[in-house]
C-alpha cells in the first residue's frame, strides 16, 4: 500500500518496522522507530498499518515523535484503548483518523490508507467533500457523486468503530476552510450521535 500511496501522489518518506532498519522497500527507507526515521526525514503525518492490539502503542509512538496527524486502519481496537487514543490526541492538539477506516484521499493530490487501485474509476476531482463511517457505501455514494457530474475534493473515512479518533463535527471546519469544497456529503452508520452533532454544529 505504501507504493500505491506514492503512485497517488503521497510523499512517503520512510517506514517503520522494528528490527528491519536499513532495509529499503520500493525506494522507501525503513527505520526501527518513528524517532529514528524522523531525524533523517521530517514528516507531519503517520499512516499506521498495524493490528488492533498494537495500535495504541503505535499512535503513542507517533505522538511522542511530534506527529500531529495520524491515520490508522485497524479494525476492532479495544474500546478502552480507543478512548485512550482519542484523549491522548486531544490533549496534545493532534488528530487521529480511524480506526476501521480505508483512509483519506484528496483527489489528484495524495492518498493515505487502503483505498482501492481502481480509484480513478470512482474518484474524480470536483467540489464535494465526503465524510464517511461506512466502508461498503463509500465507493457507491462517491460513484454517484461523480456520475452526477460533481466530483470530490477530499474524502475522509472516520471509521466505523464505536469510538473513532475524530468525529464528523470536528472535521467540518476543515471542509469549510477549503475554497475548493462547495458542499459536504456525510455517510453515516446506525448508532451513535455523530450525525446529530454535525447538524448542531451547522
What are these regions (language model features)?
Residues 1-202:
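Catalytic-core regions of core metabolic enzymes
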Amino acid at each position: 500500500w505504501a507504493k500505491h500511496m506514492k503512485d497517488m501522489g503521497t510523499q512517503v518518506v520512510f517506514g517503520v518496522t522494528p528490527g528491519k532498519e536499513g532495509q529499503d522497500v520500493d525506494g522507501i527507507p525503513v527505520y526501527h522507530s518513528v524517532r529514528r526515521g524522523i531525524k533523517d526525514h521530517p514528516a507531519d503525518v503517520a499512516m499506521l498499518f498495524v493490528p488492533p492490539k498494537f495500535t495504541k502503542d503505535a499512535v503513542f509512538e507517533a505522538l511522542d515523535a511530534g506527529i500531529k496527524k495520524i491515520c490508522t486502519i485497524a479494525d476492532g481496537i479495544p474500546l478502552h484503548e480507543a478512548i485512550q487514543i482519542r484523549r491522548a490526541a486531544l490533549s496534545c492538539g493532534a488528530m487521529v483518523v480511524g480506526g476501521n477506516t480505508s483512509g483519506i484521499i484528496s483527489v489528484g493530490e495524495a492518498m493515505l490508507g487502503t483505498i482501492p487501485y481502481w480509484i480513478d474509476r470512482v474518484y474524480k476531482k470536483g467540489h464535494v467533500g465526503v465524510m464517511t463511517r461506512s466502508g461498503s457505501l463509500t465507493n457507491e455514494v462517491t460513484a454517484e457523486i461523480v456520475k452526477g457530474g460533481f466530483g470530490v475534493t477530499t474524502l475522509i473515512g472516520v471509521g466505523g468503530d464505536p469510538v473513532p479518533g475524530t468525529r464528523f463535527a470536528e472535521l467540518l471546519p476543515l471542509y469549510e476552510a477549503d475554497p475548493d469544497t462547495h458542499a459536504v456529503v456525510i455517510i453515516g452508520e446506525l448508532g451513535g450521535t455523530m450525525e446529530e452533532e454535525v447538524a448542531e454544529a451547522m
